[in-house]
Amino acid sequence: MKTTPLHAKHLALKAKMAEFAGYDMPIQYETGVLAEHHWTRDKAGLFDVSHMGQVMVQGAGALAFWEKLTPSAIGKLGNDTAKYTVLTNEQGGIIDDLIVTRLADDKFFAVINAGCKDKDIAWMQSNLPDNAKLLHLEDRALLALQGPKAEKVLHDSLGIDASSLGYMRFMKHDT
């Protein structure tokens, strides 16, 4: 079974672990799932979503690649803007949903569902033009901070002011 970069930390925090999408993932901690649910709904919860697929597509053909494989006008995205969209097959049928973020004119980051990532990445690779490169970021952690106090947690713990960060926007921060 695969593990995320945070696996040892989950074990140290005595998480109850279970298989999900081929990964040994935490499903709850000692406080219990109900307490965790309420904490996240009232405050903020941090989730390890590193099992999801993460890819970087860059190069002169990157934009054309996304415009071919999704029905979205990815070219209209400004830099540091994300779009929830779908990955389509040759007939326009939906393969999976994903989030594509435009980082620069020719550089994109995408997050793909865990259960389908191998199939999705293979489809992407088979449609990649010669003037674009796809990197599967397998060893990178991915965290989701959720809840009404998420903005405050970012500010208090990392000094990040996300108050002006809009919906589906991206911000880089080095710690």
Regions found by a protein language model. Give the residues of each.
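Basic, glycine/lysine-rich polyanion-binding surfaces/domains
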Residues: M1-T175
